[in-house]
Swiss-Prot record:
InterPro entries: Ribosomal_bL20, RIBOSOMAL_L20_CS, Ribosomal_protein_bL20_C. Binds directly to 23S ribosomal RNA and is necessary for the in vitro assembly process of the 50S ribosomal subunit. It is not involved in the protein synthesizing functions of that subunit. This is Large ribosomal subunit protein bL20. GO terms for molecular function: rRNA binding; structural constituent of ribosome.
Amino acid sequence: MARVKRGVTTRARHKKVIALAKGYRGRSKNCYRAALQRLEKALAYAYRDRRARKRDFRSLWIVRINAAAGLYGLRYSEFMHGVSLCSIGLNRKMLAEMAVRDKGAFEKIAHAAAQACGRTCVVAQSNS
C-alpha cells in the first residue's frame, strides 16, 4: 500500500482557517494557531449573541411600548393586559413599530386596551 502524506489536507485545512480569519488584527490573520484560537472564540461569541439578540430586541420593543403607552396614562403591563383582553393579535414587535411609525393606530389600540382594563385613557399633550 502506498504511503499517505497529509500535506495536501493540512494545507487545505490551514487555508480554510486563514480565509475565515481574514480581517482580524495582528498575528490572528496569518498565523494558523493564533487564527484558529481567535476563530473558535469568534464563532462562540456569534453563537451566544445570536441568542442574546433575540432578548435584546424583545427588551427594546418593551421599552418602546411602555414609553408610548405612558403617553396615554397606561403602564406597559396594563397596556398588554388590555391588548390581550381585546384579542388584538399583534405581537410586541408590531406594537413597537406602530408606536414609532403609526401613532394614530397605536392611540386607537391604547384606547381599546384602557377600556378593556376599565381605565380611562389620558392623552398627554406632546410638544412635537
